[in-house]
Amino acid sequence: MSISSSTKEEISLKKFKEKVINDFRTVSLSREVSIQGRREVLLGKGKFGIFGDGKELPQVVMSHFFKDGDYRSGYYRDQTLLMSQNLLSAREIFAAVYGHPDKLYEKMSGGRQMAGHFLTNTIDENNNWIDQTSQKNHISDISPTASQMSRLVGLGLASKIYRNNSINGSEKFSKNGNEVVWGTIGNASTSQGIFFEAINACGVLQIPSIISVWDDDYGISVHNKDHTTKESISKALAGFKITSDSPGIEILEVKGWDYQSLMKTYSYAEKIAREHHIPVIILSLIHI
């Protein structure tokens, strides 16, 4: 199996086994962190007890196609992605749960943000720009649900502008507009107006974005039938789907527990988003 979609990268069976085992290790550790973290919050020892349980496998798969220079605009269930990228440890997650004020231990915000709000730096300690093309970038998460969508549009549009325009001094920000912005959102938040506005903007502007929707069949305690037309956001958005004679958005569905299908789906999504600037929505069915 190839891990990269843009170029066919042949790997040995031994190397492939190592990747699969490492993914399993990350998924297992992240799930245990979620279980123990929720316990600490319910016992009153920590703050904010929403973690990434149930979304682990799609996120480790996503990490294989998330390249240096790319950006994430997501929310508080994305811990597994950062763990898979070696940007977050179990110890650091608990430092955030306990609100540790020292950035040496809680390096995301030094306890200033809610737990589960992730970021990477864009400037160094001397206020100089960091080379964003040589790192995996995570824009600082914010609390209002679906608010990540408008930021996703801006980040994706930046890549398009860099590809279509020669901009002096852009070496630390883009490699000819080959960056993808990766969005994550829960199925309940897709019922919000800001989501539909952002999706429409992605389709109109044709920006390089891949939006993963985690579909648990429920949004908190509300079933899909009570907040989503046709009980499926991919069906509700069918009119946005790209066709042979009209640009739009590629809309895909995949079972969130199917490792092989997830690999194929994200490989295809990354290829068309990165190379052709076609926006993609992936509905990951966690509950089936």
PLM features: what roles do these ranges have?
Residues 1-47, 68, 76-78:
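Cofactor-/ligand-binding subdomain signature composed of acidic, glycine-rich
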Residues 22, 28, 32, 57, ...:
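Generic recognition of stable, solvent-exposed alpha-helical segments in well-folded globular domains
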Residues 33-37, 71, 103, 107, ...:
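Intrinsically disordered or highly flexible coil/loop and linker segments, enriched in small
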Residues 45-207, 212, 219, 223-241, ...:
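Cofactor-binding active-site loop characterized by glycine-rich and histidine/acidic residues
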Residues 213-215, 256:
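Active-site-proximal beta-strand/loop segments in catalytic clefts of secreted hydrolases
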Residues 224-228, 232-236, 246-278:
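Conserved phosphate-handling catalytic cores of large alpha/beta enzymes
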Residues 286-288:
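Conserved small/polar residues in nucleotide/adenosyl-binding loops
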